[in-house]
Amino acid sequence: MLKVLAIETSCDETSVSVVSNSNDIYKIHSNIVASQIEDHSKWGGVVPELAARKHLELIPFVLEEALEESKISIEEIDAIASTVTPGLVGCLRVGSITARSLCTLYSKPFLGIHHLEGHLSSILFSKNYPKPPFLTLLVSGGHTELIKIGERRIMQRLGRSYDDAAGEAFDKVGRLLGLSYPGGPAIAEIAKKGNSLKFNLPKCKISDKKGGFLKYDFSFSGLKTAVLRLVEKIRLNGDEIPIPDIAASFERVVSEVLVERTIKCAVDYDLDNVVVVGGVAANDTLRKMMISEAGKKSIKVHLAPLNLCTDNAAMIGAAALFRLKFKAHESSLELGISGRLPIDQANTLYANKPPF
């Protein structure tokens, strides 16, 4: 049984987890997540410097709690992993330095993990997770991407957002409507009271230089602006803003765009399994719509467990365990951190010469 200690500090969650893999059965022994939502809510979003300082404060306690809850000592751990890209640089540095220091102290192999690969790997904790090739919709606060997963974790990005990610749009529209941070859960809750067909909001597309539109790419900035203009118009008329109806209409359109382009991509590439991961994957409207529409095309949908949709270290550990299956995937202790790295370059994190 392979056991990994994993650390996630890419944004505003300080998380440490102990996970294992035995005969392709992935198990979580502990997954401690210390959220900073209350620290950032008064600002309406994550403040990078504040987040990094909070990680420094919390990491010793979260690490101790994760090991204690797992009942696995650090000496019994086979490898240590941390998120090294993408994310907020100051935040990434806290987790990376902690992990590499532990590796040096206890003579353990180090694996630097791509944050998005962590999200992709959250599905490994589900029963009957699909075998490649399959299509993954990764939809979170910072990323909206369609990724084809091949054998040995070869990844091909087929679609992406050109401006705001879906989760970012939820946060900005939530702030516009005067809702609490983060916007995703707040919009989902108040949308239950609204009429999702009340407002006809736009489904924005990205123009293709060759003509027409990019079939699998996303744009949510225009949708966000459309909500702003709608609110301004209602205010000018002196009417009360129907927040539940706007929230429900916005949630519906975002879900429709994600579902329509995901299924189109899966059909075009002849992929009969779709995986949905990331923070926005917790949205109930999106989950139900994806299952319903995919079923019409005989496509099976695999949803990340609700408790693993948002940032956590267990998913980072799962990515590390998957990499360890192929023996050669170990990172140099000289590997640094980077705010950006395309998902299809994740394999470079295990090269003899680190990419950063």
Curated annotation (Swiss-Prot):
Coiled coil: none annotated. Its main location: cytoplasm. One of its GO terms (molecular function) is N(6)-L-threonylcarbamoyladenine synthase activity. It catalyses: L-threonylcarbamoyladenylate + adenosine(37) in tRNA = N(6)-L-threonylcarbamoyladenosine(37) in tRNA + AMP + H(+). GO terms for biological process: tRNA threonylcarbamoyladenosine modification. SUPFAM superfamilies: Actin-like ATPase domain. This is tRNA N6-adenosine threonylcarbamoyltransferase. It comes from Prochlorococcus marinus (strain MIT 9515). The lineage of its organism: Bacteria, Bacillati, Cyanobacteriota, Cyanophyceae, Synechococcales.
